[in-house]
UniProtKB/Swiss-Prot annotation:
It comes from Shewanella denitrificans (strain OS217 / ATCC BAA-1090 / DSM 15013). GO terms for molecular function: DNA binding; DNA-directed RNA polymerase activity; magnesium ion binding; zinc ion binding. Its EC number is 2.7.7.6. Keywords: DNA-directed RNA polymerase, Magnesium, Metal-binding, Nucleotidyltransferase, Transcription, Transferase, Zinc. It is an enzyme of class 2 (transferase). This is DNA-directed RNA polymerase subunit beta'. GO terms for cellular component: DNA-directed RNA polymerase complex. Zn(2+) 2 binds at C814, C888, C895, C898. Binds 1 Mg(2+) ion per subunit. Binds 2 Zn(2+) ions per subunit. Zn(2+) 1 binds at C70, C72, C85, C88.
Length: 1410
């Protein structure tokens, strides 16, 4: 009995561990793992199927093939446990030891481990400071390497070819030692004294000047230090003993017909053993050197293939010509150990079936077929049957269930009651793809799904399948109910809006109910209350659309939950009054007293959730759905061909457009317009014709004229089915109706360009063959795109999840004093996103001051909810500094205050919430809705870009932002600064619009003056860039020599002459060094100064500048001295959609990025080279100036002598995120990425909260470059984790030492994932080999902080409910550590009683650990 107990205990023994360390295995360690040496390549005996002795499957080394039975059969059964059979030498034990016992092979000659050799950068190469080619030549026996130079002129590590070796031998004899093969490399590695080398390199580092050499030394130093601190020895990178995988992990399975299926590893091992044995034999026979050498090389190659096939040379192939799967292939890739088995497991207690509609279900229910339920809940049913005494044994219970006896169904009903099940639909793109429901048993074989959750699952009923999972334990059921129940997931985690909104039929039904019809039966009746209305409708006295008066009683609930009732008479319709029956008390009747479209219903649900909470909303949503279905049925809205009414004006509009096109065609033929202009104009004509037709059609469809009861004509919204469907948002859109009843319009080619002949027909008239062909042309690309899009979007989501997976909320408040500045987002003058949308649910970082006073409106650390946002709007606050995860100071994780509101729950976020994964899902999930294409700007778009004025849309007053200006002779302002902005402020001080205005803009209004809507307030010439005079005086030409640096041109039409400066390249050699300029002099002939400075007013002229003034001409302030023609900017393709989002998150550099000023100072141009200009920026304080070479073809925005600020744009182009971070700081780069990503999603109408993008940006910014190391362990120029550096700095500051300084670095998401602290997480993401090699060499240990690592080692994740478990474990660990520390310094035991007590403690401790 005691044995049995001991045996059972031994089974459940699990090691408690807090981290996983990876390192190099020494030969002794490998031998200690091994249970014996594998000496023969044989596997099993083909006749007896018994494993061969000392072979790859040997039972003596690896354990018995059958449980508790030795190979020869002498000992069987449990009583002989642990006996080793004297005949066959097999230990009698469980057969599962064959999964864990390893063997080994003693190699006759050392072999280099290919990962440390070939995985770049080559660790062996770095260690020995030799090139990879040289090492390979040594290893594969092509040349010798000197190991011990002795007293000769040779050096250690020098390469010798066969000839030079022989020459050296003749010259020096055996003074020196040179070898080839892995032995040589082994000896070189052994000879390295790490400590000495490290000291030496640390000393020489500061004195190294060349950048490349410094980098190389730093790399080598880091590698050596990694080896030194981790206790790995360099020579362990060369294998002397090869471990053999346990046989059950590389199985050999007999198939019928006497053939075998085997794992590729067996072939690879056999190869190694064969060659190793042959090499041993050759060495015993003392064979000639060349043969031994060849055999050693082959051994090296076979070990390479076993470890990583195909890494070097050609992959070894099996009998069927496919490369064999090596050990490395086993762990990497989608089918490897990490992604196939550790991160994605299959689960039991699950089933799947097709889904159908369950319109009668409540929101928290799902219909489960009886057959499935019976199968899934079997264990519970057995338990209940036995507990009830209906079955005596489990076997009897099984029989009952198989026969499906009547009692079984009763028991099933009970078991299933309040036992939630989880439904999942693949692809699970966000957390709403798995939700819990209470099952309701149904007949049939399809799962019934509640229609309102379809949106979250993205499910429809055209054959979709779903999987059911049963949570077994009580805890799992609790979590499913409390966290995953569909009723708890009403708001979307991506944007905080209801995800449970009615769509399609339900919307149509509610819309139909709430419409009004003039002259409806029962119009003008007056009702005392809603129940009378119900009576009137039921008896048919009044129809549903009739306009009536009803007395309504409303309940309003104030903040304290006090209810007050109020009664009023409302003009409404029968249908709306009926809707008020299901309206929960506390909501205003006005919410349903309108046409209920999809938007209105969504708003209604949102209001309900915010005012009344979860429970009421859920009940209300269900009621809305039932009502909607009911009235959709009653309405009988359907689509017939007569509903598509074609407007009569269509034909005249099309004829007009055709006439215009003909006219342009004639102009083109007579040479008045170019081909490009003709194309653009034709497309514009057709586009506007299409607009007109669709407008006429919608007017025709949407309104009908009827005679009301006073006999007067009145217009009312039409009851046309197609119009109702589109107007309510149930199905279709104006664009689709246009194709049905208007004209199809212009079509695109697969490359995105527009075909200039439109399709004038619509679907009701039908298309002819040519029109049909044109339609298919662009449509096919759409289908191909969709397939690619899904894959790309999935990959983006995977990268996002991987970079953000370990970000969890771990504390309440980190105390960060700063945050991001939030302003309303304004583009091209329109407010795209008001301030309230951007700050709702976030925490204030710096007190919000009431505008125009000193009073604090919202104190720091206020969570801005809807009420606060209303207050901010009342006081017209136009910027708020809010806390953000980007500026959060928490070390490993973030704090709740910096994150703000949990969007899916509506209150501040809880501890342990996995915000990283939620953010990744929220960004990735709509990825499939984004487009895949690059937009080519054609037609209207490219011409709009050359705008030349600002026309305001709102009345208000004018404000200028960072603008310098001068007044010209007419008293108008002329802008003389770059990147100036002009804003319109309303009377409350709120910013309504904002525009960028270029240098040289003339303003029609002064600052702070009033403007009216539609007024043009600024003008500029888009095609030339002026040089504006800032003083009045006379023009003096400098270095302007006719025919050398300039030419005179006379305009043929006007006869005016102007001076054109020659480009440097076009000048003669005499003019190359001259710098043409215009100087301004006063009446006395002295230089004038620029106002406020002592800099003379002298303007250098670049090449091609056109000077309109002559020498000595008079000039006024604000006049243009010269104009530089701008080549119209090349139409750049705009990358849109998914590729753009991926580029932003990968932080890729654009092709021709904008050039930004690296420092603030004055611009000048240095000596030019062949294709480049030298730009010099000299700072005002006289410190070091900055030089940059810029290609000539780049269009510069700056001139000689101009002042620029750091980070200002010098040459236009797309800005690179890295530059923005370096020159303008974290806040700007965050703003840039957030806005750019949001632009893409906004185009598709997808709403995502900014927080999610910020979370990803935080992860992209978590590394930094050390600029000076201070007293820390870091090296200068090393990349380190920001949190690590901050922790180290805090400790140093506490000790009064110098902290390290660092520069934040922006990494793309792939790079950032691979650079995480956790090697397990990185290895399971991408580039497994590289990650593991690096980790092993550094002896890294993984602290299992993130989610992925914990899933892989089979623990609860440190998020959600697992967060508490991990917290508890950490607390226990801390107390254990404290105990250990205390035990070390405990005094010696003095009395017997104390000794006894200690012993008792120890025993208790030991007992507690079991």
């Amino acid at each position: 009995m005691k044995d049995l107990l001991k045996f059972l205990k031994q089974q459940s023994k699990t090691e408690e561990f807090n981290g996983i360390k990876i390192g190099l295995a020494s030969p002794d360690l490998i031998r200690s793992w091994s249970f014996g040496e594998v000496k023969k390549p044989e596997t099993i005996n083909y006749r007896t199927f018994k494993p061969e002795r000392e072979g790859l499957f040997c039972a003596r080394i690896f354990g018995p093939v059958k449980d508790y039975e030795c190979l020869c059969g002498k000992y069987k059964r449990l009583k002989h446990r642990g006996v080793i059979c004297e005949k066959c030498g097999v230990e009698v034990t469980q057969t599962k030891v064959r999964r864990e016992r390893m063997g080994h092979i003693d190699l006759a000659s050392p072999v280099a481990h290919i990962w440390f050799l070939k995985s770049l950068p080559s660790r062996i190469g770095l260690m020995l400071d030799m090139t990879l080619r040289d090492i390979e030549r040594v290893l594969y026996f092509e040349s010798f390497v000197v190991i011990e130079p002795g007293m000769t002129t040779l050096e250690r590590g020098q390469m010798l070819t066969e000839e030079t070796y022989l020459d050296a031998l003749e010259e020096y004899g055996d003074e020196f030692e040179a070898k080839m093969g892995a032995e040589a490399v082994l000896e070189l590695l052994r000879a390295i004294n790490l400590e000495e080398q490290i000291e030496q390199m640390r000393e020489e580092l500061p004195s190294i000047n060349s950048e490349t050499r410094r980098k190389k030394v730093t790399k080598r130093l880091k590698l050596m230090e990694a080896f030194f601190t981790s206790g790995n020895k360099p020579e362990w990178m060369i294998l002397k003993v090869l471990p053999v995988l346990p046989p059950d992990l590389r199985p050999l399975v007999p198939l019928d017909g006497g053939r075998f299926a085997t794992s590729d590893l067996n072939d690879l091992y056999r190869r190694v053993i064969n060659r190793n044995n042959r090499l041993k034999r050759l060495l015993d026979l003392a064979a000639p050197d060349i043969i031994v050498r060849n055999e050693k090389r082959m051994l090296q190659e076979s070990v390479d293939a076993l470890l990583d096939n195909g890494r070097r040379g050609r992959a070894i192939t099996g009998s069927n010509k496919r490369p064999l799967k090596s050990l490395a292939d086993m762990i990497k890739g989608k089918q490897g150990r990490f992604r196939q088995n550790l991160l994605g497991k299959r689960v039991d207690y699950s089933g799947r079936s097709v889904i159908t509609v369950g319109p009668t279900l409540r929101l928290h229910q799902c219909g489960l077929p009886k057959k499935m339920a019976l199968e899934l809940f079997k264990p519970f049913i057995y338990g209940k049957l036995e507990g009830r005494g209906l079955a005596t044994t489990i076997k009897a219970a099984k029989k009952m269930v198989e026969r499906e006896q009547a009692e079984v169904w009763d028991v099933l009903d009970e078991v299933i009651r309040e036992h939630p099940v989880m439904l999942n639909r693949a692809p699970t793109l966000h957390r709403l793809g798995i939700q819990a429901f209470e099952p309701v048993l149904i007949e049939g074989k399809a799962i019934q799904l509640h229609p309102l959750v379809c949106a979250a699952y993205n499910a429809d009923f055209d054959g979709d399948q779903m999987a059911v999972h049963v949570p077994l334990t009580l805890e799992a059921q609790l979590e499913a109910r409390a966290l995953m129940m569909s009723t708890n997931n009403i708001l979307s985690p991506a944007n905080g809006e209801p995800v449970i909104t009615p769509s399609q039929d339900v919307v149509l039904g509610l819309y139909y109910t709430s419409r009004e019809r003039i002259n409806g039966r029962g119009e003008g009746m007056v009702f005392a209350d809603v129940s009378e209305v119900e009576k009137a409708y039921a008896t048919g006295v009044a129809e549903i659309h009739a306009r009536v008066k009803v007395r309504i009683t409303e309940t309003s609930i104030d903040a304290d939950g006090e209810k007050t009732k109020a009664t009023r008479i409302v003009d409404t319709t029968i249908g709306r009054a009926l809707l008020s029956l299901i309206l929960p008390e506390g909501l205003s009747y006005d919410l349903v007293n309108q046409n209920m479209g999809k938007k209105q219903i969504s708003k209604l649900l949102n209001t309900c959730y915010r005012q009344l909470g979860l429970k009421d909303t859920v009940i209300f949503a269900d009621q809305l759905m039932y009502t909607g279905f009911r009235f959709a049925t009653i309405s009988g809205a359907s689509v017939g061909i007569d509903d598509m009414v074609i407007p009569d004006e269509k034909y005249t509009l099309v004829a007009d457009a055709e006439a215009e096109v003909l006219e342009i065609q004639e102009q083109f033929q007579s040479g008045l317009v170019t081909a490009g202009e003709r194309y653009n104009k034709v497309i514009d004509i057709w586009a506007s014709a299409n607009e007109k037709v669709s407008k006429a059609m919608m007017e025709n469809l949407s309104v009908e004229t009827v005679i009301n009861r006073d006999g007067v004509e009145e217009k009312q919204a039409s009851f046309n089915s197609i119009y109702m469907m589109a107007d309510s948002g149930a199905r279709g859109s104006a664009a689709q109706i246009r194709q049905l009843a208007g004209m199809r319009g212009l079509m695109a080619k697969p490359d995105g360009s527009i075909i200039e002949t439109p399709i004038t027909a619509n679907f009701r008239e039908g298309l002819n063959v040519l029109q049909y062909f044109i339609s298919t042309h662009g449509a096919r690309k759409g289908l191909a795109d969709t397939a690619l899009k899904t894959a790309n979007s999935g990959y983006l989501t995977r990268r996002l999840v991987d970079v953000a997976q370990d970000l969890v909320v771990i504390e309440d408040d980190c105390g960060a004093e700063h945050g991001l500045t939030m302003k309303p987002l304004i583009e091209g003058g329109d407010v795209v996103e008001p301030l309230r949308e951007r700050v709702l649910g976030r925490v204030v970082a710096i007190d919000v001051i009431k505008p125009g006073s000193e009073e604090i409106l919202a104190p720091r650390n206020t969570l801005l909810d809807e009420a606060w946002c209303d207050i901010l709007e009342e006081h017209s606050v136009d910027e708020v500094i809010v806390r953000s995860v980007i500026t959060c100071e928490t070390d490993f994780g973030v704090c709740a205050a910096c994150y703000g509101r949990d969007l899916a729950r509506g209150h501040i976020i809880n501890h342990g919430e996995a915000i990283g994964v939620v953010a990744a899902q929220s960004i990735g999930e709509p990825g499939t809705q984004l487009t895949m294409r690059t937009f080519h700007i054609g037609g209207a778009a490219s011409r709009a870009s050359a705008e030349n004025n600002v026309q305001v849309k709102n009345a208000g007053s004018l404000k200028l932002h960072n603008a310098k200006h001068v007044s010209n002779i007419d008293g108008k302002l002329v802008i003389v600064s770059r990147s100036s902005e002009l804003a319109i402020i309303d009377e409350l001080g709120r910013e309504k619009e904002r525009y960028k205005v270029p240098y040289g803009t003339v303003l029609e209004k002064l600052e702070d003056s009033e403007v009216t809507a539609g007024e043009i307030i600024a003008n500029w010439d888009p095609h030339t860039h002026p040089i504006i005079s800032e003083v009045a005086g006379s023009v003096k030409f400098v270095d302007m020599i006719d025919g050398v640096t300039m030419t005179r041109q006379t305009d043929e039409l006007t006869g005016l002459s102007s001076v054109v400066v020659l480009d440097v390249g076009a000048r003669t050699s005499a003019g190359k060094e001259l710098r043409p300029a215009i100087r301004l002099v006063g009446a006395d002939g002295n230089d004038l100064m620029i106002p406020g400075t002592d800099v003379p007013a002298q303007y250098f002229l670049p090449g091609n500048a056109i000077v309109a003034k002559d020498d000595n001409a008079k000039i006024n302030v604000g006049d243009a001295l010269a104009r530089i023609p701008q080549e119209s900017s090349k139409t750049r393709d705009i990358t849109g959609g998914l590729p753009r989002v991926a580029d932003l998150f990968e932080a890729r550099k654009p092709k021709e990025p904008a050039i930004l000023a690296e420092i603030s100072g004055t611009i000048s141009f240095g000596k030019e080279t062949k294709g480049k200009r030298r730009l010099v920026i000299t700072p005002a304080d006289g410190s070091e100036h900055y030089e940059e070479m810029i290609p000539k073809w780049r269009n510069l925005n700056v001139f000689e002598g101009e002042k620029v600020e750091r980070g200002e744009v010098i040459a236009d182009g797309p800005e690179a995120a890295h530059d923005i971070l370096r020159l303008r700081g974290i806040h700007n780069v965050a703003n840039y990425i957030v806005n750019e990503v949001q632009d893409v999603y906004r185009l598709q109408g997808v709403k995502i909260n900014d927080k999610h993008i910020e979370v990803i940006i935080r992860q992209m910014l978590r590394k930094c470059l050390i600029t000076s190391a201070g007293d820390t362990e870091f090296l200068e120029g090393e990349q380190a984790e920001v949190a690590r550096v901050k922790i180290a700095n805090r400790e140093l500051i506490a000790q009064g030492k110098t902290p390290a300084t660092f520069e934040r670095e922006l990494l793309g998401i792939t790079k950032a994932s691979l650079a995480t602290e956790s090697f397990i997480s990185a290895a399971s993401f991408q580039e497994t080999t590289r990650v593991l090699t690096e980790a092993a060499v550094g002896g890294k240990s993984d602290q299992l902080r993130g989610l992925k690592e914990n899933v892989i080692v089979g623990r609860l994740i440190p998020a959600g409910t697992g967060y508490a478990y991990h917290k508890k474990r950490n607390a226990l660990r801390a107390t254990e550590d404290a105990k250990k520390a205390a035990a070390k310094i405990a005094p010696a035991v003095t009395t017997a009683s104390e000794a006894e007590q200690n012993l008792a403690d120890l025993l208790n401790l030991a007992g507690g650990e079991e």
